[in-house]
Amino acid sequence: MNREKLMKMANTVRTGGKGTVRRKKKAVHKTTTTDDKRLQSTLKRVGVNSIPAIEEVNIFKDDVVIQFINPKVQASIAANTWVVSGTPQTKKLQDILPQIISQLGPDNLDNLKKLAEQFQKQAPGAGDVPATIQEEDDDDDVPDLVVGETFETPATEEAPKAAAS
């Protein structure tokens, strides 16, 4: 194509200014405020009440803790619904454990012991050896292997005895 033809075509395709083609459909940007308004209206129908003076919420999931500092907490006990709003921070359980020990009551001491056992099992090196020993102790039906012996030798010795009887 000629350079002159390209220049003419470029002039017809303008991005703005007088005589440009308008968009037929307006782009709709969905914002989070509309979602929040819908959620709040649904929560009003459920009948949630705001719970004031909550400084911290920790949600435990696997080995991760989702922590909310100064959240907005709403609850509906009749609907078994709890809403925690705020900015979450994801932390490892090991990092947050020293802070929450003082908050745990006597009921949760058993849970704390279970968590400590899990950490010992997951610890590299020393934690792996006791776990394998426990697994070996659980297998009472399986005989232990002895160096130099196979299971075939006792089986071949017992076969002639059984045939002789």
Swiss-Prot record:
Biased amino acid composition, Low complexity: 144-165
Keywords: Transcription, Transcription regulation
Region (Disordered): 120-165
SMART domains: NAC
Residue ranges of domain NAC-A/B in the record: 33-97
PROSITE patterns linked: NAC_AB
Highest taxon listed in the record's lineage: Eukaryota
Gene Ontology annotations for the cellular component aspect, listed alphabetically: mitochondrion
Record note on quaternary structure: Part of the nascent polypeptide-associated complex (NAC).
Name used for this protein in its record: Nascent polypeptide-associated complex subunit beta
Species assigned in the record: Arabidopsis thaliana (Mouse-ear cress)
